[in-house]
């Protein structure tokens, strides 16, 4: 009879059932709150040619100078290329993905958290356990793998209760 608490930001009905089953919970109290975060603003942009999407992203970031943001991509190559294009346009950005050695990943994460860089361009390898309350925007360069991933990743914006912008290409 050891008390157990299980917490998650997002869980489908199946995941909730699995948690109850695998933790051996009997008649658990389950509390669910709304997915709605009134401080987050969602926008969908049509996917155009790569150079046009990059121009749109650069323009948006330039209009949000000094504000931290995360750009999610689906693969390492795109992450590296996009970070390089942002740097070439005068934006302090770094790439983050599982292919980097752990020391470099830690350094880049610390640079982002310490505001040495404005933007981190990342695969889904970035984010779990990251709590930077003042992320003002999350951009998805590619469609996320699932709606749950999208919600989880956009939820990194505006954790301080202030406005966050979520843009999907």
Task: Describe the residue ranges of each PLM region.
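Helicase motor core with emphasis on the C-terminal RecA-like subdomain
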Residues: 1-169
């Amino acid at each position: 009879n050891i008390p157990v608490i299980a917490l998650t930001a997002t869980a489908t009905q199946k995941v909730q059932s699995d948690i109850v089953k695998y933790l051996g919970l009997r008649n658990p109290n389950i509390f669910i709150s709304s997915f709605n975060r009134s401080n987050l603003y969602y926008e969908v942009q049509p996917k155009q040619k790569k150079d046009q999407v990059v121009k749109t992203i650069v323009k948006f970031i330039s209009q949000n100078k000094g504000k931290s943001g995360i750009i999610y991509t689906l693969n390492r190559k795109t992450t590296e290329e996009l970070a390089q294009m942002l740097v070439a346009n005068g934006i302090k950005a770094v790439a983050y993905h599982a292919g980097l050695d752990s020391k470099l990943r830690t350094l880049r994460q610390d640079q982002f958290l310490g505001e040495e860089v404005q933007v981190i361009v990342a695969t889904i390898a970035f984010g779990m356990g990251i709590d930077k309350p003042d992320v003002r925007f999350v951009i998805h360069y590619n469609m996320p793998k699932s709606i749950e991933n999208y919600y989880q990743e956009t939820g990194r914006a505006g954790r301080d209760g202030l406005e966050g912008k979520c843009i999907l290409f």
